[in-house]
Amino acid sequence: MSRAVRACAAAASARVARSVSNPRWLTTMTDLTLSDSPVATIEAALALHQADRLEEAETLYRRILDAEPRHADALHLLGLIGHQYGRYHEASELIMAAIEIKPDAIYYYNLGNVMQANSRPAAAAECFRLAIELRPGYVDAYNNLGNAQRLAGNARAAVDAFCQVIALQPDHGQAYNNLGNALLDLNEIPAALEAYQHAVALRPELPEPRSNLLFAYHYSDAFDPRAYLDEAMRFDALVTQRAQPYTTWRVDLAPRIGRPLRVGIVSGDLKAHPVGYFIEGMLAHLKRERVELHAYATRDVEDDVTARIKPRFASWTSLASLDDAAAAARIRDDGIDVLIDASGHTIHNRLPLFAWTPAPLQVSWPGYFASTGMRAIDYVIGDRYVMPADEAAHFVERAWHLPDSYLCFTPPAIELDGGPLPMLANGYPTFGYFGKLAKLTDHVIDVWSRVLRDVPDARLFVKAPHLDDSREQHALAARFAAHGIDAARLQFEGRSPRDEYLAAYRRVDLMLSPFPYPGGTTTAEALWMGVPVLGRRGARFLSHICESLLQAARLPEWIAHDDDAYVAKAVAFARNPAELAVLRTTLREQVLAAPLCDAPRFARHFEDALHAMWARRVDAAPRAAS
């Protein structure tokens, strides 16, 4: 066991039972009158609530409060219904009113859950702390405290919280899963993988830890495509065993002549997220007579990007409250021809519902970079760079190549130029990396240190989540120090709003893309800001992404074939400020005119791909509609 996981397990002690019991009996509204005893009435309302008869439960809670306005349990439980309906302000007001009457650990706990759902992790963390003060050893509160701290950017504190859960309840599989998430944030890859493996061993029936394990594998220097695919196929076996796949659909398996393909996209990232950034431009140029889009959001979180793309969909359905069977039934009933998984094994995915085959043709694009392992998914959309023929064995799905890149970048809706080349004023070159710390493997640190040694006056600017924590800064500086790089040559900065983040590119002369997990969105953003990106060719879909984007931006000379070429190119480019200065003023125009940002061109290719896949599906196994 790693030290991080071993430390959690070593503190194991007594288990803590859950505090909320199931209702003992169920009744109907017609059985109740206000003359019933208060205990019986609240238990009846709770029974309705637990049976998911929310409207009836809400009515009864309100009747209780009409008779007894300071009934703390009714206020609290009515707040929970508000939470379930997404009425977060109302929910928090009701639960806070209950707390004012009767401070209770579970009230604070559920108030924390409301704050968490409403994207207020710092407030949520405070609620969970108060719950723990009232009930020491409150396992669920510690677990959710860790989740809130992680979302608030304090992964170190989150690790401590999850370790406390494991100390109280050593077989808490979800806590090990959450611990893995926090360790991954902190770039402790072996410990994260081990935590996920513990979660899978403790809760083998849960898809989430398996997905997280698969996702985390990609950060490891020891990644093995065959081992990854074997694990992905075990995930498929688990979810397929539970599914009841459809074999008939409410669509005609016939050529789509004179009417569009009905295409569903399942995603939790239809927002300010790489998925949102890469589909937004294309959506505006799809021909509705060819493709009719339907969104299936896996979570109810929306923002400005959501507001811009939502009108491009013929329908928008939330799957957040539906289990896989119900979600699959809904999609099938909607008559979807092609269903796209836009998440893969990333967070907020709903891959298990694809095992139900709610659509006759199922595709993975654009939110993942490897095989899902799902036999029910027919194709992965890629391109000749990310899915070369000699890597077909990495997938259970078939490859479908788009003519250019498989991605089309939407330029930010922010008026901001790249500014002058910094090294002209500074007198030295500044390399940059903006992204996750977990991508900075020991191999990357070694190669980048070689670059810095060969350009002795250069600086490296790293901007990453968690680097506003001095402990993380010292840890990263120590890794470079082990290769002889002085901390004075390093500049670290944490997360910032997107406009400030984009402005930070003005302080960089050229970007270094890591490997084997390169920058995707960050590569495109840098190019748009006039900052060229040096990439390294890899040996699987993920490690080819930067290569694909650079080819689509017409910058093939910025792709290195191996470590030595990467170092040589970095040194040569850094010593040629004249060329970098020209790129600074011309690169945005070049990128906007290149396939990388040509949304109309990409939309035609995307439509053609969907219709060609559909034609093959029709030819392969035509079936009558049910």
Question: Where are the language model's segments positioned?
Answer:
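Short glycine/serine-rich donor-binding loops of glycosyltransferases
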Residues: T522-T523, C546
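Substrate-binding clefts and catalytic carboxylate motifs of secreted carbohydrate-active enzymes
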Residues: G432-H443
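A conserved nucleotide-sugar
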Residues: R290-E292, S449-A482
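A short structural motif in glycosyltransferase catalytic domains
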Residues: P514-P516, G535
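Short acidic/histidine- and often glycine-rich active-site loop of Leloir-type glycosyltransferases
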Residues: S543-R554
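Short alpha-helix at the nucleotide-sugar/activated-sugar donor binding site of glycosyltransferases
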Residues: A526-W528, Q551
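Alpha-helical solenoid repeat scaffolds of the TPR/TPR-like class and their adjacent stem/linker regions
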Residues: S2-Y428, D446, A478-I485, F492, ...
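Short hydrophobic "strand-cap" motifs at the C-terminus of beta-strands
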Residues: V266, F434-G435, K463, E493
